Amino acid sequence: VGTDAAGNLIGRREGTQPGLAPLVTGSHCDTVMGGGRFDGILGVLAGLEAAQSLHEGGVLLRHPLEVIDFLSEEPSDYGISCVGSRAFAGTLDAAMLACRNEAGESLAEAMRRIGARPDGLAAAARGPGGIAAFVELHIEQGPVLEREGLPIGVVTDIVGIRRIAFAVTGQPDHAGTTPMDIRRDALVGAARLIDAVHREASAMDGHPHYVVATVGRISMSPNVPNAVPGRVDMVLEVRSNAQAVLDDFPERVMALCHDDFRRLRVGCSAMPLTQTPPTQCDGIVMRAIAQAADRLALPHRALPSGAGHDAMHVAATGPMGMIFIPCLDGRSHCQEEWASKEQVAAGARVLAEALRVLDAR
């Protein structure tokens, strides 16, 4: 057991065949503020349990087995998520390391503070072909498996995420003396845009791609009770497993609102913020997970992940797949996050068996 230059905690069990790349499992132990006890932590503890069960059963794998607790998967004070898995893949670059929190501390400085070595990240990077396969066990963080009464999900892909800043501009005026028919109310225009986002994502989802979209940040000026809003700034986040949807969605909702904006006499501009492409799970790993579930007589279904995970970065180093288990009411990133002992055990059993299947191929 040791810590790499990126601060990832890594346990390794050697295999019987020298020179083979490792099979890797794991996740993360950090949480969002007010988060629960299963997101990420499940994958780390289940990986340890899989390694322990192999040891207790006297099962020797051909490949080395590594269990990794990746550093800082959740969004950090430095504006960077998946710090450890990005470093593992060799994509944690100088610009990211230079990002600072509100106190002025850089990500690199914070990593040094906890004992990592950001100047030596090259040693932590595995690069393409650096692993034999990666399997991450995780709660679904959604309602599908629970709703369908299924214990196991085989993840097909991890959504890409695109964020766009919209500015709706009108004209601030006196709320009491400006007639309704001549107002240029930016908030009304913003409301039309938010409604279009909801309607368009609802119409597109499942035909055939996974699509969700949210306006989760909004600010307004003058933002006082007695003035017509003159400007609204907001951030749209769209998630999909199809790059074409990510590329087109902002323009689609703008087009839907064109006539409304004209009637309301408001303008609207869009500025791209960030974009992460979708990540496909590897077919070999998906089949290994499904085969493992079948061997254990555990029903399963394929489904996409609507959340980002360390796995999407680790995919740059080798074949990647994910196992989902249900969580109560689909809740996550909250204190109510929960999975039963039986659900956790089923996921851990599938993980251990999938590693054996992958080792034998």
Question: What label would you give each PLM region?
Answer:
Residues V1-G36, L54:
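Acidic/His- and Gly-rich active-site-bordering loop/insert found
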Residues G2, G26-S27, H300-R349:
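Zn-dependent metallopeptidase/amidohydrolase metal-coordination segment
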Residues D4, L60-L61, L121-A125, T177, ...:
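Flexible, glycine/charged-enriched surface loops at secondary-structure junctions
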Residues T25-H28, G34-E74, R162-V168, P179-A201, ...:
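Alpha-helical metal-binding/catalytic segments enriched in His/Glu/Asp
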Residues E73, G79-Q243:
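Midchain, well-structured core segments that form catalytic/ion-binding scaffolds
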Residues T214-S221, V235-N241, G267-M286, M312:
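A short beta-alpha structural unit
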